[in-house]
Regions:
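Conserved catalytic cores of phosphodiester-cleaving nucleases, focusing on short active-site segments
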Residues: 38-40, 46-56
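Mg2+/Mn2+-dependent nuclease catalytic core
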Residues: 56-73
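Short, flexible beta-strand-to-coil junctions
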Residues: 43-44, 55, 82-87
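Nucleic-acid nuclease catalytic cores
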Residues: 73-98
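Beta-rich catalytic cores
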Residues: 34
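Acidic-basic catalytic patches of nuclease active cores, encompassing PD-(D/E)XK
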Residues: 1-29, 43
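Helix-rich interaction surfaces within compact, conserved domain-sized segments
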Residues: 96-109
Length: 109
């Protein structure tokens, strides 16, 4: 996460998760480019990797490394969570390329 609005998005997610029975870790890894921002263990003990993004207009600014990570991990519990105004949209990893190209005009699955 590189910009203040994404940091604010993370803080709001962290606040919301604090009242759940999930376990989460924010990943800050500059050595493995494209690694998602959040590792989440849900109440069913399944892990999820989640990239957090804030839309700029309709655009979702995913780096080529982030898209590549999603493409490599499609079919897994890897996601892109996008905030646009008051809406929060959850996209599967296999939608990353289309999300990069179409932005939030793309329908989440």
């Amino acid at each position: 996460m590189s910009n203040p609005s994404e940091a604010n998005f993370w803080r709001s997610i962290k606040t919301g998760l604090s009242s759940t029975d999930t376990c989460y870790t924010r990943l800050e890894n500059s050595s493995a480019l494209g690694t998602p921002d959040l590792l989440l263990l849900d109440r069913n003990k399944s892990f999820h990797l989640i990239e957090l993004k804030v839309a700029k207009g309709n655009k979702v600014l995913l780096s080529p490394h982030q898209v590549a990570f999603c493409v490599r991990h499609r079919g897994s519990n890897s996601w892109v969570l996008v905030k646009k105004n008051d809406d929060v949209l959850l996209y599967r990893a296999d939608q990353a390329m289309d999300l990069f190209e179409q932005g939030v005009k793309l329908e989440p699955h």
